[in-house]
Swiss-Prot record:
Transmembrane intervals: 35-55, 93-113, 119-139, 189-209
Subcellular compartments: Cellular thylakoid membrane
The UniProt record lists the keyword Metal-binding: yes
Keyword annotations of the record: Electron transport, Heme, Iron, Membrane, Metal-binding, Photosynthesis, Thylakoid, Transmembrane, Transmembrane helix, Transport
Co-factor(s): heme b; heme c
Phylogenetic placement of the source organism: Bacteria, Bacillati, Cyanobacteriota, Cyanophyceae, Synechococcales
Stored PANTHER family: CYTOCHROME B
Note on how the cofactor is bound: Binds 2 heme b groups non-covalently with two histidine residues as axial ligands.
Organism listed in the record: Prochlorococcus marinus (strain MIT 9301)
Pfam families named in the record: Cytochrome_B
GO BP annotation list: photosynthesis; respiratory electron transport chain
A GO cellular component annotation in the UniProt record: plasma membrane-derived thylakoid membrane
Name under which the protein is recorded: Cytochrome b6
Protein family membership: Belongs to the cytochrome b family. PetB subfamily.
Length: 218
């Protein structure tokens, strides 16, 4: 016990961790807060599950048009608990989208987007867009018939935009047609760009909530 106390005192002297702990645990929670105010936190938990299971799958997934489908099949049938890891990833993805939608409704119906919380709302909207992008890019990674045609349709949508439409299509596909470059880009977006972007906006979102507090009742 003496050793653990001395270690604690060493960190306390340098980092003042007790002050941080007191600030986190003593934050005032308004009496009107109920279970529906937990929807944002549940969305965060789903994201963390996504991150963990997605990271585990990168050890087996091969982002090539010739090996993507077979690597997913190998994960599902030959890797110990691989089927469970991928299934949890898919289930938590669906749960994340559902919790996000319910969270948006809760914030809107309780006026959580009003002054002075406009920027908190904006960061939330950006995270909602990123979450949808997660779904689109992840859907294509098995590179089966459903994934391939989903990519072809989604990546072709920007073609309707005047002037820059064709450029955006080629940017998404990595060329004029859907192929290896497309899968590589979607894999990069899904496993690196989108997770880090979402993490940054989540941090901003939580810091704003921490600073401004929870909005009052209607």
């Amino acid at each position: 016990m003496a050793n653990s106390s001395s270690v604690y005192d060493w960190f306390q002297e340098r980092l003042e961790i007790q002050d941080i702990t007191d600030d986190v645990t003593s934050k005032y929670v308004p009496p009107h807060v109920n279970i529906f105010y937990c929807l944002g936190g549940i969305t965060l938990v789903c994201f963390l599950i996504q991150f963990a299971t997605g990271f585990a799958m990168t050890f087996y997934y091969k982002p090539t048009v010739t090996q993507a489908y077979s690597s997913v099949s190998y994960l599902m049938t030959d890797v110990s608990f691989g089927w469970l890891i991928r299934s949890v990833h898919r289930w938590s993805a669906s749960m994340m989208v559902l919790m996000l939608i319910l969270h948006v409704f809760r914030v809107y119906l309780t006026g959580g987007f009003k002054r002075p919380r406009e920027l908190t709302w904006v960061t939330g909207v950006v995270m909602a867009v990123i979450t949808v992008a997660f779904g689109v890019t992840g859907y294509s990674l098995p590179w089966d018939q459903v994934g391939y045609w989903a990519v072809k349709i989604v990546s072709g949508v920007p073609a309707a935009i005047p002037v820059i439409g064709d450029f955006m299509v080629e940017l998404l596909r990595g060329g004029e047609s859907v192929g290896q470059s497309t899968l590589t880009r979607f894999y990069s977006l899904h496993t690196f760009v989108l997770p880090w972007s979402l993490a940054v906006f989540m941090l901003m979102h939580f810091l704003m909530i921490r600073k401004q507090g929870i909005s009052g009742p209607l």
